[in-house]
């Protein structure tokens, strides 16, 4: 422990408990942690890894949805701005609806009927569109 920071050894269960009990998350902009945070209604400060297109997009969409902020450098001003706005982001996250996998499971079931004939047909048509 140093001032208001607690350093902990790796622990999957400990991490999940910390994520569930925290007020907000500050991390890179990877999809998995961001969506887990949204599901738990945790405001998010994203620090996208430079050159990682997925993370750049995730950070952009995070800010657009108003679930948190997307920053390049963790300055005290940027972090302070995020901390001040946690109640606003938490309010916005109340409207977050987890989509689950039902739609993709339904579509996969449709495509795999008749030993995958529909999936092969879909793939063949799609390949014709690619030059």
Kindly give the residue locations of the regions a language model identified.
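C-terminal amphipathic helix plus adjacent low-complexity
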Residues: 80-131
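Catalytic binding pocket for nucleotide-activated donors in carbohydrate/polymer assembly enzymes
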Residues: 34, 38-92
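Donor nucleotide-activated moiety binding/catalytic core segment of transferases
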Residues: 2-38
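Short amphipathic alpha-helical segments and helix-helix/interface helices
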Residues: 16, 59, 105-109
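Short beta->alpha linker loops
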Residues: 10, 29-32, 74-78, 99
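An acidic, carboxylate-rich microenvironment
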Residues: 14-17, 78, 103
